[in-house]
């Protein structure tokens, strides 16, 4: 039996993907404590998990990336907010370790401060990764712009230029405050993005899998792809679903406000005269601002699991959580990215042929209606993604990897998804040395 402590960013989309893993660890006889936001605490406590709230100041930091005018500007705001959170996480994570006396740690990859404490603790630990990971690769485009993979000369030139522009800008933005924060507790400075995302944690549990995630020949050996991590809080049955006979379309906004309410408005208007039944959950947006047509039901929150069992399509902001949850249920997606990692998620939907993407600048009721029809025809691609998620092993595979880390056995066997001959992502210094040789 091992005492595990998990620590996440307080946003729901950061804690929900790891819940099945935590429940599986408990089923295997381990003790599990979770530090996260108040919003998730009550539901998780009802499941028997030991849940404690993170510092309330962490929850007061607003994600204001939606105010930016460009995708790059939004990413700069996002990483600056994460750095602000990180400074608060350091004493909070130290408090959690002192109270829980864990033997192994699981840390949200966006919790930069908690990760620094984990690194310095001397305990076995792992990152939980719940978004398309920004690790450079010879096989995939650079993170951030949602570029389609290209493997010809033009693609390689494009990727090199974009990597220098986007990743370089992000590194110049986030590394100075992160390294200043890390220096305060004696942690070494980070050299680049790969230093953090690929080489810092002994294990990185990546909650995704092929064919949704792009195939890479150079995954870091610390990575395990374990599937979607789809989870919903337990809820009462939705009896009204039994009366729905038309094809059901689920519309949903981000649970973390990003001003994406016009997605719901366009969907309600565009699908009002169609032979479908629309269920819209507005989440971070107040539902009182919308008119509800006769063929729709509008709520702020509903459990998505029972709805997905009946759904023909999901229209969403391309958040990683709802997108993978839909695809894990075999439901195709109409993705309308608004920012954050959503351009990357939406592009993966298209490349996997599991749905369509509609840029938010082209979001109109008529265009959305057409896109929903096109997405409904992608059920075969969604089924392939669902099969890939299931084959990755899910919570059982994640728990097994965590047990290996806790016991010191991780890395003794070749990971099943790492191609023969693959190697860890080299540091920037190593790459430059290779270029000079």
Tell me the role of every PLM-derived stretch:
Residues 1-52:
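N-terminal subdomain of nucleotide-sugar transferases
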Residues 34-78, 155-156:
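Conserved nucleotide-sugar phosphate-binding/catalytic loop shared by glycosyltransferases and other
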Residues 84-156, 211:
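Conserved nucleotide-sugar donor-interacting segment of glycosyltransferase catalytic cores
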Residues 100, 365-437:
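C-terminal amphipathic helix plus adjacent low-complexity
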Residues 105, 299-346:
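A donor-sugar binding/catalytic signature common to diverse glycosyltransferases
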Residues 126-214:
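Active-site-proximal region of nucleotide-activated glycan assembly enzymes
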Residues 208-313:
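Donor-nucleotide binding loops and adjacent catalytic segments primarily
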